[in-house]
From Swiss-Prot:
Enzyme class name: lyase
Source species: Aeropyrum pernix (strain ATCC 700893 / DSM 11879 / JCM 9820 / NBRC 100138 / K1)
Protein's UniProt name: Tryptophan synthase alpha chain
Pathway: Amino-acid biosynthesis; L-tryptophan biosynthesis; L-tryptophan from chorismate: step 5/5
Underlying gene: trpA
Pfam families: Trp_syntA
Length: 252
């Protein structure tokens, strides 16, 4: 179960701004991404920034939430012609996280990334890793810049599909000046484990700086959501394609 290295991903909230438009976005991104990160809408997306939070809330208000949305995720993956990873909160939702894992496995997801797990349920990390593998998926683990080094080493030893390094404690806010140091430090600790970096990446230049610091891939979410919400789907595609082209040109 491999993902592109170096790689590029776009984050989309499932069913936002509507199911049809969500699938149209995925189709539009065909050829511009290596894989998708698709978030299950939840009423309390605490570890997302204001732009992505709004997409969650609008999807929930329209009646879309929970594991039932993963049929749309599977269809979006097919439209884009790439594999996908599910982003799902382990605690901030009325359904069980076990149910999310089972349904994600049934719908062909590579992995489920729970951003709140290390903060809210740190004692359940090993259970999550084992359950993911039992269901035929690989675990993905979230880390923030303020994570103790021992946690990153713990992650390394669990050998996940990827470690998602957030460059900010919440997505979509200004790229911090210290981000290069954060990525470089994390790389030294996690060794050869695949490291995906996200949050506040808005241009090919941002993406290349993160890769040069040691990340294997980057993900863009808030900037794509802002463009889509203002009716600029073509610009969203252009952004994604330009970032992927820059990454491909750089090579491994």
């Amino acid at each position: 179960m491999a993902i592109a290295r170096p790689g590029f991903s776009v984050y989309l909230t499932i069913a936002w701004p509507s199911p049809d438009t969500f699938l149209e976005i995925a189709s539009t991104l065909k050829g511009c991404v290596d894989y998708l990160e698709l978030g299950i809408p939840t009423p309390k997306p605490l570890y997302d920034g204001p732009t992505i939070r709004l997409t969650h809330l609008k999807a929930v208000e329209s009646g879309y939430s929970g594991p039932k949305t993963l049929s749309l995720a599977e269809e979006a993956s097919q439209e884009a012609g790439v594999p996908y990873i599910v982003m799902a909160y382990a605690t901030e939702q009325p359904w069980s996280f076990s149910e999310v894992l089972r349904e994600a496995s049934r719908k062909g997801a590579l992995s489920v990334l729970p951003p709140d797990l290390p903060f809210e349920l740190p004692g359940h990390v090993e259970w999550y890793v084992e359950e993911s593998r039992r269901l035929g998926m690989e675990p993905s683990l979230f880390a923030s810049p303020k994570f103790p080094h021992r946690w990153l080493d713990r992650y390394r030893r669990l050998d996940p599909l990827l470690i998602y390094l957030g460059l900010q404690p919440a997505t979509g806010v200004k790229l911090p000046l210290a981000f290069l140091r954060n990525v470089k430090t994390a790389r030294k600790i996690v060794g050869q484990v695949y490291m995906l970096a996200g949050f506040s990446i808005k241009s090919p230049e941002d993406a290349l700086r993160v890769l040069e610091a040691g990340a294997d891939a980057v993900v863009v979410g808030s900037e794509v959501a802002r463009l889509v919400s203002s009716g600029r789907l073509g610009e969203a595609r252009h952004l994604a394609c330009s970032i992927r082209a820059a990454i491909s040109e750089r090579g491994g």
